[in-house]
Amino acid sequence: MPMSSFKRKIKAIQIKIASPEVIRSWSGGEVKKPETINYRTFKPERDGLFCERIFGPVKDYECACGKYKGKKYEGTVCERCGVRVESREARRKRMGHIELAAPAVHIWYLESIPSVLGTLLNMSTSDLENIIYYGSRRVIERAFIVTDPKDTPFSQGDVIYETEYRIYRKKWDFDVEQAFVVKNPKSPVLSDIDGEVTLKTEKSITGREITWIIVKNITRATHTVLPGMILVVKDGQEVEKGQDLTKEMTIDPVYAPFDGHVEIDELSNTITLKPLTTSKDQPVVFTIPYGAKILVSNGQKVKKGDQITTSTSLPAVKASISGTVRFGSNLNIRALEDGNFEVLSTGEVYVEQVIEERKYPVFEGALVYVNNGDQVKKGDHLADRFLFEEEYLSATEYKIFESHYPTMFDVEERTENDRPIVVITDIDPEVSKETGLKVGDIVTENEYEAYLQIYPEKIVADAGAQAIKKLLQNLDLEALQAEIEAELKKLPSSSSKAIKLRRRLKMVKDFLKSGNKPEWMVLEVVPVIPPDLRPMIQIEGGRFATTDLNELYRRLINRNNRLKKLLELGAPEIILRNEKRMLQEAVDALIHNGSDSEGKRSRRAVLKDRNGRPLKSLTDLLKGKKGRFRRNLLGKRVDYSGRAVIVVGPNLKIHQCGIPKKMAMELFKPFVLAKLLGEGSSSKTMRKVKKAIIEKEMPEAWEVLEEVIKGSVVLLNRAPTLHRMSIQAFEPKLVEGNAIQLHPVVCPPFNADFDGDQMAVHVPLSAAAQAEARFLMLSRYNIISPAHGKPISLPTQDIIIGSYYLTTVGKEFDSLKEEDVKWKFSSPEEAMLAYHLGFIKLHTPILIKVAVNGEEKRIKTTLGRVIFNGILPEDLRDYNRIFDKKQINALVYETFKRHGIDRAADLLDDIKDIGFHYATVSGLTLSLKDLKIPPERDEILRKTWEKVRIIEENYEKGFLTEEQRKSEIIRLWMSVTEEITKLTSKTLAEDPFNPIYMMVNSGARGNIDQVKQLAGIRGLMIKAYDPRSREIKSKIFKGQAIHEALTFDYPVDKNLREGVDILQFFISTYGARKGQVDTAMNTSFAGYLTRRLVDVAQSVTVAEPDCGTHEGIRAMDLIKEGTVVEKMNEFLFGRVLARDVLDPETKEVLKNPETGKEYTRNTMLTDDDANFLASYKKMVDVVRYEEIDITELSLPNMYAEIAEPVGEYEEGTELTWDVIKAAKNEGKYRIKVKVYPVVGTVYAEEEPLYDKKGERQLLVYQEVINEIVAKMLEENGIEKVSVRPDIIVRSPLTCESEYGVCAACYGMDLSNHKIVNVGEAVGVVAAQSIGEPGTQLTMRTFHVGGVMGASDIVSGLTTVEKTFEPYAFLREEKSGGKKEIRKYYGSEAILCEVDGFVKDIATDESGRTVIYIEDYAGNIHAYKVPKRAKVRVEKGQKVLRGETLTSGAIVWWKLLELESEKGVMTAMNLLKIIKNAYVQQGVSIHDKHFEIIFKQMLSMATIVDPGDSDYLPDQLVPLVDIKRFNREILEGNAKVEENRKWVIGKTLAKRIITETEEGELVELAQKGDEVTEELLKKIIEAGIKEIDVFEKDKVVTYQILPKEPIKYKRRLLSLKKAALNYPGWLSAAAFEETAWVLTAAAIEGKVDPLIGLKENVIVGQLIPAGTGLDVFAGIQVEETPRAAVEEELA
């Protein structure tokens, strides 16, 4: 038996960060290859992105190789291909995964603002990005060169940069010199002089070789030295001319020292004496001195003592010039012990005199072109270079080269390097202490290497996502929480550091609370979404079209596989880094490709396809209008629907619509089939036959269709669906043709016309849906608009003209006396007969007998009026009235109020029939002759042009400025236009049956403005303008009539009937185009407004019948700048009283004398009640003297003071029970009192009441009179005052329901004038009611007629936008902690902060205007007026708290701070402004709708002091949550003592960490410890306010110290902000900034309780409003009546 039940299945949804294990658990297998589909077989590749083994079979119940086919094998895993046999639906659900070769950071957590990773790790986003993407840091630093390594691993000449040097320096001892980097050395090295080359090499201080090329230009004196001479100079010694080079000497003869043989060597000029073989003597060598003779021959034997040579003398050789001694290259000498040299053979000694010398040092590695002794010419090449580019020189080396090559090269003292950075992930505590480094610090790779050398294996640093992962794994969140809390205690709460810390603390707490692990923000595994959600489709030409996601996945897999391969090969680090970075970028692109539109900079390259279009990533699939949320979850397509053009259906009833037969057959096909099948058997062949019957359109099919349709309803919808009346239910009637027929009266709610509009039809399928549609949505029950409570389904155009024509009369009718009437009838039937027989016409005056209020009367009327009144309810008939549009509307409304909705619906049908009929009969036509031009027009124009000429003359003579001239002309033409308009109207009215007059006058079409342009004068034209233009801005600031800047001062003085000339035509085009453009521009804007409104208010439903509050808002006329925006009766209509309404005089509950209704608390006010209460006023005494009997058990029911002293109470004290007690103690029974009946009433006269002198206003309209004011009245001798009762009505603003509003505070459901039902979606209704007319609120800046003030420019939508987004127009700039308002329109309005009087308005020394206000106590308050503002008050005027003293924009937060908790004053001010915008456009919307939106805008508060909550100062928190939290704290604080007893003996569920006074973290207790009294005492002393203990395997938190409540300030949010701060994350994510909302929610592990409507639509269940409420959940609806009977039988 088919049944449908409305159980809501999902209670709440939680979002968390997925851990790698969770992702793997979702997966059906790892995707290892980037392949998708085999291009030949079109089958998915194994292990690829579409693999059947991982994701499920492509064909239903068939494995890949085809071994198993059919449902019987369901669940079998094929052993050949590994595919599980199941439904192909699995490919929509089963996921895969990719194991990453290196971790990758999830971009949402990095790029969110503020960055989650950044906040948690306390790092800046740029540093994080640098680490994740292997970035580098640019370092400008000095370099050093090691000159002496000592006991370090360095070598001499190693270059060390400053950063490393500082690190090494602390631990090691070695010597360095600063290094200089050589730049632009000039080459080659050229000789500057002619000369001889000498080469010399030496080692520098850094152990490198320097070759010295020395070129000398010299004169040389040669001196020959002979053997035996003794040289007394050294090589290189300086000598003077004539100085001895050798000694002068006499050489003795040589004698043989022993016996032996002589050997003479003439070549070397020596004699060798060899001893005899028997001797032990050694051989001796003698040099033969120059000039000595040898006395022996070669080989001769000599005896000891024989003379061998003769003696000789050698002269001294003297230097012939001064200079340097140089030994010749052939000089053979022997060094002697005294430092001189003995010459062994003849040679040369030179004395060189250097004329010029040049030294050229050359660094090692340079190529030297010359050798020692080479002669070079000036300009010859000596070497290819002296230094290399980028060579590092030590300071000493630099000095050498600098002195020899002063301008030949540059140096840099500091070098600029890009250093890869790494982050420390692990460090030995001692090393940390020593170096000051900690985990999470960023160092360059060079620094890291330095630390590693000093502390091997004690420090670890890394870059890339793996480093971030390690850091996150290292976080001890509990310790971190204790640390931050301890640090916060030391800081002032408003400091920026504290705010930053609090943000971090909140995040830490979120992670702890949600159970998310921080390292999960770094992905090891990437999930692959099911293939059917990213399909590949074959397109013609054999190619494949695929989703961007596949391309992103492919890139990711390719990079991942390449990285795996490189890791296996052991590739160098630099290649791996690059590959890892690319992998990270691939993961980023998959999750969020592209720089974000939300104003974030992105360092990543956007991945694009062939056409350069960015690929759509997962984030793009969620966000925006085309995203998953708004496109698919909130905007689903509906089956069983059709769409067609609409045409008018004049013979339909109001609840019917015509559906084309073909369409109906298609829509109801299943029902028709079922009906046909129900008769015969249900075999397959029968099915086919029946289907054929339908498809071949056989007659029996149509019969069955007629039967099926009977009693069912369909829904009709016209886009755009701006409010709920855009979808209504109708009973379908089958019609021929292809168009849907629509009843003409329901056009206004649909905003439909028949110029080609289309409408959609939907069929509610289940019985429950049918019932809902029929009883709640049927068009006859939706005549009344929920926006304002008046009818909205109304007759228009032809129907109105028909009714008007029927009831109108000729000119002579009113003047005709009854006795002159020719025709008299006894009954309407008789009159009709006369009409049909042609005796009378519809408009012939007749006398006729009709029943009026139950009695027969003879009246003068016309047959038309009799016919029309025939269809009206008897008590509403009026035979002497013309029924135009207004009258008909009032008639329908009155019928609804008196006789209910059904009678009203029938009346609409009757009016439609009669209207159409008589519109046809009337033969209404239009011709040019009907446009009557007023004869006086030409004369008026002539005079006007004359006046214009005079103005122009005055201007030319200089009597008027340009501004004044323009202004005068415009005013003149405006008044003329108005005059001609009146004349045109008058001229037309001369013939009541003039078709144009009838159309305009009846309200059927057109207005007098259009007629004026056709037959009168077009008048002044508007310019198109740019609101940002300087002219316009300056006008606004000066507060001038803005329209003057926007108007041509040359009028179109012709009308369209006679035609305009070329110039005037061109002037007209401006305005025409502006209208078009404005409309186009504002439609989308209005749509966005509606969307924001709905988002803000969607969760407001009627939650309970009564919240029980006694609060409310005061009923009053809404007055904005002197104009009444809304009268009090409209304000009261549909509301519920919050308190009894008391008669101002008697103070008893007020009673309506006509109906006898008493106005007590919780009474709902109808139209009549509202009119009665709004008009009820009385003259009441200000004061009365009475003597009262104090033995009675009640005080007087009005404010009273004692008129004589009683006990210690002085005269004038308020009469209370204490005073009476004192009187009784004195033995009195009666005391004299002054009673003030006016206290607590409201002043009801529009003219203010002045004091005796007439200088001061004592009372202003609508002021509530208190005792202070009453005494002032008394002092000024005022005896009686006209007052009305103080009426407090309930309002959504003051409702105390936790969610939504209660029925009593909302009041009447305007669409049926009954109290609203629980579950009604009042928020959405409110949003629609405000948004729907938005399109009408286009910038109608130019109202022709009446001079407009500056307030007009900001008309319409701009005003609405300004009110709902109050901060978009006021830029708050914080300077020095003070908020300053930058003006948008004019300046800021000054608010009065007290009740009082304007004492004076004066100017101070600086020339600024100051307003002095005196309050009731006589204190003076001064307010300085900003330069551009206008003073809005005058001396002696009474002002009340919160009123504006000057022109300008109200700064809402200032107003909010002025008032009490409720925010009512702010809301009422907003209401005035916004109502004004709508009223000007003639749009009526009930206040309660605005109040609901304002309630939502005021629903948040800013935390001033978070107390013991997890909130941060300045955080926005729903008021409900704050109040709940504070309530819980008060309850919790009461239980502290009890809890302390309870926890003794329990086991701790979490460890307890606290900070000592020295700032160290200590652990007080471990998890699992037992709580003893001693431990508890310690915990309490440490200031820990709650502990977690185990109770029956559950963790329970106990509060053991009192907590601080939250202090807060009410905030007025803009619509957008209010929607984004919505507590449920699903709805907020669907609104805007999807990624950020989801990120924040995932971290918190946020639970969406699915309270609002949107969330439930998103998860696909009934909304918790109306029949979707849990109250109705148990109801089961029988689909077929038979089933119940069967059940009984069973």
From Swiss-Prot:
The gene is rpoC. HAMAP family: RNApol_bact_RpoC. Binds 1 Mg(2+) ion per subunit. Binds 2 Zn(2+) ions per subunit. GO terms for biological process: DNA-templated transcription. InterPro entries: DNA-dir_RpoC_beta_prime, DNA-dir_RpoC_beta_prime_bact, RNA_pol_asu, RNA_pol_N, RNA_pol_Rpb1_1, RNA_pol_Rpb1_3, RNA_pol_Rpb1_3_sf, RNA_pol_Rpb1_4. Zn(2+) 1 binds at residues 63, 65, 78, 81. This is DNA-directed RNA polymerase subunit beta'. DNA-dependent RNA polymerase catalyzes the transcription of DNA into RNA using the four ribonucleoside triphosphates as substrates. It comes from Thermotoga maritima (strain ATCC 43589 / DSM 3109 / JCM 10099 / NBRC 100826 / MSB8). It catalyses: RNA(n) + a ribonucleoside 5'-triphosphate = RNA(n+1) + diphosphate.
